Design a protein with these regions (language model features):
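N-terminal helical cap/lid subdomain that shapes the substrate entry/recognition surface
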Residues: 1-69, 73-78
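Residue-identity detector for glycine
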Residues: 10, 16, 23-26, 38, ...
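Residues at secondary-structure transition points
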Residues: 16-24, 41, 45, 59-66, ...
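Asp-based, Mg2+/Mn2+-dependent phosphohydrolase catalytic module
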Residues: 73-76, 89-199
Length: 199
């Protein structure tokens, strides 16, 4: 996805950019872009181009993650509140949740647009925990991006990686609490009391 939009700005894709940028926004994304394209690159133009491409690519709702419905049903049955804390724009979050008829399941929706620093800064997750009325140590973070896992670990959260586009590497294995192949496995671990003691 990045190659086409970068080309419109006269830039070539640099290996590793997608993994480094995934899950970031705002100043965190700008820092990634400067690392790859130099301190004087037009970060706002690059980000605008990438956001425009993402908005076009994701007009149709992506498929739900396997096990999502079962996990939400389990959490609701256990009276465990949920928050969406995503680096995506709020318009994208709402579009996906509305298309899936899932908006009402969540106590709060938190977008990366609300913060100057995004993942790997844990601020977005700390804000989510505040909305839930929980401490990081009793709050489960589910993440598929490296930056998200970094943010969860830095904030002291129970961080579970559910890999999607990028597999867990040695750094992720040092940082996360657990790795699950899908959300069904997350549910199983919760049922077995392996993630949150309250469950």
């Amino acid at each position: 996805m990045y190659k086409r939009q970068l080309a419109t700005l006269g830039l070539s894709y640099k290996e590793g950019l997608d993994a480094a940028a995934r899950g970031s926004a705002g100043d965190s994304m700008r820092a990634v872009l400067r690392r790859f394209y130099g301190p004087d690159c037009d970060t706002d133009a690059i980000m605008d181009a990438l956001h425009a491409q993402a908005e076009t690519a994701f007009q149709a709702p992506p498929p739900k993650k396997p096990g999502l419905d079962e996990l939400i049903a389990y959490l609701e049955a256990q009276h465990i509140p949920m928050v969406v804390a995503s680096s995506s724009r709020m318009a994208s979050i709402l579009r996906h949740l509305n298309n899936w008829h899932m908006t009402d399941h969540f106590q709060a929706l938190i977008s990366g647009e609300q913060f100057t620093s995004s993942k790997p800064d844990p601020e977005i997750f700390l804000t989510a925990a505040k909305a839930l009325g929980t401490t990081p140590a009793e709050t489960l973070v589910l993440e598929d991006s490296y930056n998200g896992v970094r943010a969860g670990a830095r904030g002291g959260f129970v961080t579970v990686m559910v890999p999607d586009l990028a597999p867990a590497d040695d750094e992720m294995r040092r940082l996360y609490t657990a790795e699950c192949k899908d959300l069904r496995e997350v549910k199983k671990m919760l049922e077995e009391g392996k993630l949150l003691s309250e469950t």
